[in-house]
């Protein structure tokens, strides 16, 4: 009797660690493979003041709150230019909303949309990535499921910290066999005042944006002295040009730690970027508004 062939879709037969070793091995190549890109960046943000008291207006990152209004919404449409290793130049072409500026979470909102998923840290060096060279010391991994065609499998792998720490995150990722690149990653974490969930979807295998994010979804809850603020941000990127490095000139050295952000990120606005109504966005919005979001605009405009 012939030995039975192992089922490639049986997650219980797979070692998450052996898959992750390959993903972690390739991460430094993929981290620095992009030299330059230009993209249209759309961001939609919503904020709900679940609980508030008079202290809320002293939070430095908070926008101006209107009396009796708990929910706010804002959209922006920008040109984003990235130059390696980590210089981002964002020019806002159009913005509309029931407030004149985004709520910046912990003052670092742009970084939630500038994640290099293959870097050893996530979000401004605060968090150790489950793809870091030393990640296996701090994270445990598990194969949840196997998807796709037999010659083009994708593995859904969950990760969780081995010990409690604000520097570690939990969540899951989907990785592609053969190339060992990431299709999407969900990670959640917390600091003293902020809890967040971040979903990043990457381009497809073989496409020019394979190693770049195409969609972000960030949920955060901020708690401070009796105030509770919920926020949700969705971002979509549409790449116009992508320049990859010549692989023969790349080495496996990690990029140096992020330097002072004031040097690496600039945000400018067209003088007439702010729109007085939301109709302009109808033509450029990549993600339609929900009925509730339309109502927020109707009440405001």
Task: Write out the residue ranges for each language-model feature.
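A conserved hydrophobic secondary-structure block that centers on an alpha-helix together
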Residues: 149-154, 160-172, 176, 181-188
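A short acidic/small-residue loop/turn micro-motif
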Residues: 189-191, 219-220
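Extended non-globular scaffold/tether segments
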Residues: 193, 207-208, 212, 222-224, ...
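A short, polar/charged loop-to-alpha-helix boundary motif
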Residues: 194-198, 229
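Extended lipid/amphipathic-ligand handling interfaces
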Residues: 171-173, 177, 198-209
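Beta-strand-dense domains in secreted/periplasmic systems and polymorphic toxin scaffolds
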Residues: 185, 214-216
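Structured extracytoplasmic
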Residues: 2-154, 162-168, 225-301
């Amino acid at each position: 009797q012939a030995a039975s062939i192992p089922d490639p879709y049986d997650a219980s037969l797979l070692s998450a660690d052996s898959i992750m070793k390959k993903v972690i091995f390739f991460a430094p190549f993929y981290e620095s493979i992009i030299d330059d890109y230009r993209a249209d960046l759309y961001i939609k943000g919503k904020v709900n003041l679940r609980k508030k008291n008079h202290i809320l207006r002293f939070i430095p990152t908070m926008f101006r709150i209107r009396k009796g209004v708990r929910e706010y919404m804002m959209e922006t449409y920008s040109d984003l230019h990235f130059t390696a290793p980590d210089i981002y130049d964002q020019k806002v072409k159009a913005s509309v909303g029931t407030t004149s500026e985004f709520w910046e979470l912990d003052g670092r909102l742009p970084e939630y949309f500038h994640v290099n998923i293959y870097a050893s840290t996530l979000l401004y060096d605060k968090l150790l990535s489950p793809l870091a060279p030393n990640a296996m010391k701090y994270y445990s991994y598990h194969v949840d499921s196997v998807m796709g065609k037999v010659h083009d499998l994708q593995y859904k792998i969950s990760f969780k910290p081995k010990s409690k720490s604000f520097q570690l995150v939990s969540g899951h990722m989907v990785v592609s066999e053969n190339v060992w690149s990431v299709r999407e990653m969900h990670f959640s974490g917390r600091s003293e005042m902020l809890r967040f969930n971040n979903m990043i979807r990457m381009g497809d295998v073989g496409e020019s944006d394979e190693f770049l994010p195409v969609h972000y979804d960030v949920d955060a809850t901020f708690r401070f002295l009796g105030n509770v603020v919920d926020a949700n941000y969705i971002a979509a990127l549409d790449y116009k040009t992508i320049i990859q490095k010549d692989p023969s000139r790349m080495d496996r050295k990690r990029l140096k730690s992020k330097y002072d952000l004031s040097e690496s990120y600039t945000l400018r606005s067209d003088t007439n970027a702010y729109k007085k109504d939301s109709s302009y966005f109808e033509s450029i919005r990549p993600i339609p508004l929900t009925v509730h979001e339309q109502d927020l605009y109707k009440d405001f405009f």
